[in-house]
Amino acid sequence: MTPELNLKSLGAKTTYIFEYNSQLLEAFPNPNPNLDPLITLECKEFTSLCPITSQPDFGVIFIRYIPKDKMVESKSLKLYLFSYRNHGSFHESCINTILLDLVKLLEPKYLEVYGDFASRGGIAIKPFVNYAIKEYQEFKEKRLLNAK
């Protein structure tokens, strides 16, 4: 029997929000908190707007995390990332905000966000940021040294 999860997005009619909204994120209890899986989530169609020119920016967002007590619900993550569509922000700021919002929601053991943005003006921007609780600081440092 499936426990009551109180999720708002999964299984419901989808309402798309076109402006950044961290309240779209939802979590559910980690069914195996004693394990340390490294979970990878990939959003191949991330878009936001340049805060200066209002031109669209396109990228692939990679989120990797080791959950503690909560895991992110994937449809809510999709809607959250979609909410950046009309949000004006630099690539680095988007990646930092995604990390901070997920850390606040999940309180994970470890979490990283990497953005692989399409070139504009011949330069591709690929920001990486990570977070770890005290027991995972060494892992965090190694991941930072080996970031894409």
UniProtKB/Swiss-Prot annotation:
Residues annotated as binding substrate: V72, E73, S74, H91, E92
Cystines in this chain: none
Reactions performed catalytically: 7-aminomethyl-7-carbaguanine + 2 NADP(+) = 7-cyano-7-deazaguanine + 2 NADPH + 3 H(+)
The enzyme's E.C. designation: 1.7.1.13
SUPFAM superfamilies in UniProt: Tetrahydrobiopterin biosynthesis enzymes-like
Subcellular location: Cytoplasm
Active site per the UniProt annotation: C50 (thioimide intermediate), D57 (proton donor)
UniProt keywords, alphabetically: Cytoplasm, NADP, Oxidoreductase, Queuosine biosynthesis
Pathway per the UniProt entry: tRNA modification; tRNA-queuosine biosynthesis
One GO process term, biological-process aspect: queuosine biosynthetic process
GO cellular component: cytoplasm
Top EC class of this enzyme: oxidoreductase
Single GO term (MF): preQ1 synthase activity
Stored HAMAP family: QueF_type1
Purpose of the protein: Catalyzes the NADPH-dependent reduction of 7-cyano-7-deazaguanine (preQ0) to 7-aminomethyl-7-deazaguanine (preQ1).
UniProt cross-references to NCBIfam families, sorted A to Z: QueF-II
Family of the protein in this entry: Belongs to the GTP cyclohydrolase I family. QueF type 1 subfamily.
Protein name per its UniProtKB record: NADPH-dependent 7-cyano-7-deazaguanine reductase
Species this protein is from: Helicobacter pylori (strain HPAG1)
